[in-house]
UniProtKB/Swiss-Prot annotation:
HAMAP family: Ribosomal_uL4_B
Record's function text: One of the primary rRNA binding proteins, this protein initially binds near the 5'-end of the 23S rRNA. It is important during the early stages of 50S assembly. It makes multiple contacts with different domains of the 23S rRNA in the assembled 50S subunit and ribosome. Forms part of the polypeptide exit tunnel.
Domain of life: Bacteria
GO cellular component: ribonucleoprotein complex; ribosome
Annotated family: Belongs to the universal ribosomal protein uL4 family.
GO molecular function: rRNA binding; structural constituent of ribosome
Subunit details: Part of the 50S ribosomal subunit.
One Pfam family, short name: Ribosomal_L4
InterPro entries attached to this UniProt entry: Ribosomal_uL4, Ribosomal_uL4-like, Ribosomal_uL4_dom_sf
Organism from which the protein derives: Buchnera aphidicola subsp. Acyrthosiphon pisum (strain APS) (Acyrthosiphon pisum symbiotic bacterium)
Region Disordered, annotated ranges: 44-68
Name under which the protein is recorded: Large ribosomal subunit protein uL4
The keyword Transport appears for this protein: no
Amino acid sequence: MELVVKDVQNVLSVSEIIFARDFNEALIHQVVIAYSASTRQGTRAQKSRAEVSGSGRKPWRQKGTGRARAGSFRSPIWRSGGVTFAAKPQEHSQKVNKKMYRGALKSIFSELIRQKRLIVFENFSLDAPKTKLLVQKLKDINLKNVLIVTNKIDNNLFLASRNLYSVDVKDVHSIDPVSLIAFDHVVITVEAVKRIEEILS
């Protein structure tokens, strides 16, 4: 299988086992859900009626006052009382096997190629860490919402992209299924493609 290298008008031979897989929607869905769940902090916490401060005595006697009966100052229906079903810190991460994760990435890359959303460059870099240079570079190739994947993080690219909400820069070791799906296009260098082949083979 061959991919067109845009900036040098050349072709790059890649493995069909990795870049020509069928689209496995169920697998990708499972991996994306698991990845998204693992990014949750899970640190929310509220106090139940057993944990809020306050006396344990009965506010007033059961009968004879004309008021509604009450048994505790910490009742959830009282102001400053506890929360009925108090949220507690929770671990949300889900287990995904390496084979499944890699299979999902292969399927995503294959679909990006089929949809012509994966654009390969021999070299994609900037002379200085300037946002306007990156904006102009993307304008020249008619791209807006884009993920840029390089073999190693290019400091100029990284700094130039930080102020652009529709552009992200990652190296091959930090790509994830959600980022690959979220952007309209993925710009990737030849070195990065070769490294991804090594990782996923």
